[in-house]
C-alpha cells in the first residue's frame, strides 16, 4: 500500500482527470503517525521512514512533489493534494528519530512551499489561490 501511494508521485497520474490521487499518501501518513504515537511499533515506524524517503525521492529539481505535471499544475485537486503531502511529511517529522531524515524533510517542505509561494498569489505571473480549483466555488 505504501509503495503504491508513493509511486503516484513518479508520474503525472492526475493530469488526465485532474484527480486527487496525490492526497492519499499524506492522509495515510497522518493517521499512521498517530497510530505509531500510540503503539510505538518499530516495524510501523520503519515502514513510515522508508515511505518518507521514497516520497522525498520523487521531488523534482524545482522543488515540486505533485501528481500533476508542471503544464497541468494548480488546477483540479493539485493544491489540495500538495497540502496533504506537506501535512504527511510534517506529521512524520514530529515523530522522526533520525536527524538527517528530519533535515531532509525540512529542506523538502521549504522547497515545496517556496515553489508554491512563487506561483500562487496576487503578483505578476502568479495564479490567484481562488483560481487553483473549480471545486467548492474556487
Located regions from the model:
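Glycan-recognition and catalytic cores of secretory/periplasmic carbohydrate-active enzymes
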Residues: 1-138
Amino acid at each position: 500500500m505504501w509503495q503504491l501511494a508513493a509511486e503516484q508521485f513518479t508520474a503525472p497520474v492526475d493530469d488526465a482527470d485532474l484527480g486527487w490521487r496525490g492526497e492519499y499518501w499524506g492522509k495515510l501518513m497522518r493517521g499512521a503517525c498517530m497510530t505509531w504515537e500510540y503503539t510505538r511499533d518499530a516495524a510501523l515506524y520503519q515502514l513510515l521512514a522508508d515511505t518518507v524517503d521514497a516520497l522525498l525521492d520523487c521531488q523534482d529539481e524545482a522543488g515540486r512533489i505533485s501528481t500533476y505535471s508542471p503544464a497541468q499544475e494548480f488546477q483540479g485537486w493539485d493544491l489540495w493534494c500538495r497540502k496533504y503531502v506537506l501535512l504527511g511529511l510534517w506529521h512524520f517529522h514530529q515523530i522522526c528519530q533520525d536527524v538527517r531524515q528530519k533535515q531532509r524533510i525540512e529542506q523538502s517542505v521549504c522547497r515545496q512551499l517556496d515553489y508554491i509561494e512563487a506561483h500562487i498569489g496576487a503578483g505578476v505571473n502568479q495564479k490567484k489561490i481562488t483560481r487553483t480549483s473549480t471545486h467548492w466555488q474556487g
